């Protein structure tokens, strides 16, 4: 045993970690993020559920072990030799669980849906890099843990209950709040060093404040309806259902490139139908009502005006997303957008386009694809 321990203490990995201790936590955070980005696909797959549940469980255990290490709890046990790796494990699981948002919403047509998460992620990275105590700062540690826990439960509970609504969101928030406070109370009770470093009332206030802010964002419709995601949104000249597929005919334009503005031109002829086709990812057997809100920009008032709300139901489970379309006739020229919304009016995505008069001299470049 002593020989094994001596080899461990002189190992190349241990030496590497000690030499680069300043940057190791941030590397492990990004490593967890990249690992899940490359391996996760569908939130309702057994593999994805297992990985995310293991990440959350391992993160909770790592936090417990790490916070009790300062009290010498693991001295003369096999855990003592691994104590210096616990912060790295915490960073890895933080990164891995954070990546769930990006993975399950990266396919969305509306890039703004994930922008808020990227901002939060950047703030986490900056705070993690520049705070003097980094992950040893327990206020930061439990604040981030609660945010990660909240997002974890907002993914998992709808998948297991096969339902998504405001009540489910509130249940998810309550589950994350209770689990975080239970873990905090256990660590606070068993760790004298933790009781010295933090004020329990302040820590609980921070967690409840995060809970309140997330709920405020939800009711202000600033949080996407996880785990639903908009796969595709197309303004089309024709949509035909044939042999279980949808044949969608639309104008082929470079504007479909994701880094450019999603404002397409629709060359319109009088009395022509304007179609909006959308495919939405939803976990297996999750049922949800979706509707398209057609809005027209009023150039005189400088405001968007709602013209029509047209709905349809979805049942999840299809890899390519559950498909549906709506259409309108006798539309006016100008700027339009169609919001893809849940019945709680949470935005899955926005499809923007401009209706222009069709020139007979200029042929249309139409493309038909199957979905």
Residue ranges and their predicted role:
Residues 216-285:
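Membrane-interface segments at or immediately adjacent to transmembrane helices
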Residues 139-192:
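Membrane-embedded alpha-helical segments of integral membrane proteins
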Residues 1-133:
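Membrane-anchoring hydrophobic segments
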Residues 357-371:
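Low-complexity, Pro/Ser/Thr- and charge-rich linker/hinge segments at domain boundaries
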Residues 195-226:
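Internal/C-terminal transmembrane anchor helices
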Residues 305-317:
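Solvent-exposed serine/threonine-rich low-complexity stretches and specific carbohydrate-binding patches
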Residues 272-274, 315-325:
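Aromatic sugar-binding surface patches on proteins
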Residues 331, 341-354, 358:
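Short acidic/polar inter-strand loop motif in beta-rich domains
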């Amino acid at each position: 045993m002593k020989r094994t321990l001596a080899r461990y203490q002189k190992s190349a990995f241990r030496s590497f970690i000690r030499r680069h201790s300043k940057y190791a936590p941030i590397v492990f955070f990004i490593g967890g993020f990249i690992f899940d980005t490359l391996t996760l696909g569908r939130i309702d797959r057994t593999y994805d559920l297992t990985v995310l549940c293991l990440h959350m469980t391992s993160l909770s255990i790592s936090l417990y072990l790490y916070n009790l290490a300062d009290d010498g709890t693991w001295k003369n046990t096999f855990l003592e030799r691994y104590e210096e790796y616990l912060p790295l494990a915490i960073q890895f699981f933080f990164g891995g669980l954070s990546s769930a948002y990006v993975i399950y919403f990266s396919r969305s047509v509306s890039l703004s849906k994930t922008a808020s998460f990227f901002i939060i992620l950047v703030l986490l990275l900056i705070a993690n890099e520049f705070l003097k105590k980094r992950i040893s700062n327990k206020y930061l540690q439990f604040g981030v843990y609660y945010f990660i826990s909240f997002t974890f439960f907002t993914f998992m509970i709808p998948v297991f209950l096969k339902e998504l609504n405001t009540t489910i969101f509130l249940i998810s928030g309550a589950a994350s709040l209770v689990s975080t406070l239970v873990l905090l109370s256990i660590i606070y009770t068993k760790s004298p060093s933790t009781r010295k470093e933090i004020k329990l009332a302040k820590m609980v206030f921070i967690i409840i404040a995060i809970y309140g802010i997330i709920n405020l964002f939800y009711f202000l419709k600033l949080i996407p309806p996880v785990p639903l995601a908009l796969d595709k949104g197309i303004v089309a000249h024709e949509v035909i259902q044939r042999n279980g597929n949808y044949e969608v005919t639309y104008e082929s334009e470079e504007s479909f490139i994701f880094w450019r503005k999603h404002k397409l031109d629709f060359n319109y002829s009088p009395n022509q139908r304007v179609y909006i086709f959308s495919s939405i990812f939803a976990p297996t057997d999750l049922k949800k009502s979706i509707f398209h809100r057609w809005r027209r920009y009023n150039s005189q008032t400088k405001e968007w005006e709602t013209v029509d709300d047209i709905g349809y139901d979805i049942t999840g489970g299809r890899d390519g997303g559950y498909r549906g379309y709506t259409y309108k006739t006798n539309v006016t020229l100008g700027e339009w957008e169609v919001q893809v919304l849940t019945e709680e009016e949470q935005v899955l995505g926005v499809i923007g386009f401009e209706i222009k008069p069709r020139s007979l001299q200029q042929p249309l470049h139409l493309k038909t694809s199957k979905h």
